[in-house]
């Protein structure tokens, strides 16, 4: 959908196009037999800045996020968060991880990024969870993790990635592959 030369005081997409898209989706989704509820959406949030926060307060905040599936790993024996991964402003989805560092010399582990090409979202998510990498999934619809395959990724396979960092993987459904 394109809104060409909107008039009036408001001209941003969230104010002009979003209401129209909302109306379209409210009619199209039931036709496609897709329920409109939060259960079908992969939840995500933007990582805040935990640096300078007492580690117990930061880990409590992470464990009590709305999604309740974000894992918190503390590295070091200090009382205050001095660094974090992923960085402030990064998007993290369900099943993700935030690593809090409390000492300058706390180890920052890296992993060799896997080639996700052809993998299902479920397989990619399992690998990322095992390796403490945040997976940002594009193209996933209705939480259907099995019937799709990865076609691209933001971090090249074989490159070193710091644990806690994020990789964006785009998926398409098997019907679209043919």
Where are these regions (language model features)?
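Ligand-recognition elements built from short beta-strands and adjacent flexible loops
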Residues: 1-178
């Amino acid at each position: 959908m394109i809104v060409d030369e909107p008039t009036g005081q408001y001209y941003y997409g969230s104010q002009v196009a979003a209401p129209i898209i909302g109306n379209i989706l409210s009619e199209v989704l039931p036709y496609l037999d897709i329920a409109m509820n939060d259960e079908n959406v992969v939840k995500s949030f933007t990582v805040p800045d935990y640096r300078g926060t007492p580690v117990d307060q930061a880990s409590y905040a992470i464990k009590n996020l709305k999604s309740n599936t974000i894992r918190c790993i503390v590295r070091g024996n200090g009382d205050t968060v001095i660094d974090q991964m992923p960085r402030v402003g990064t998007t993290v989805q369900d099943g993700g991880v935030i690593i809090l560092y409390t000492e300058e010399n706390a180890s920052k582990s890296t992993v060799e990024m896997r080639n996700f090409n052809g993998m299902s979202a479920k397989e990619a998510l399992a690998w990322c969870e095992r390796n403490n990498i945040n997976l940002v999934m594009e193209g996933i619809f209705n939480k259907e993790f099995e019937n799709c395959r990865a076609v691209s990724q933001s971090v090249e396979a074989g490159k070193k990635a710091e644990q806690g960092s994020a990789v964006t993987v785009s998926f398409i459904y098997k019907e679209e592959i043919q």
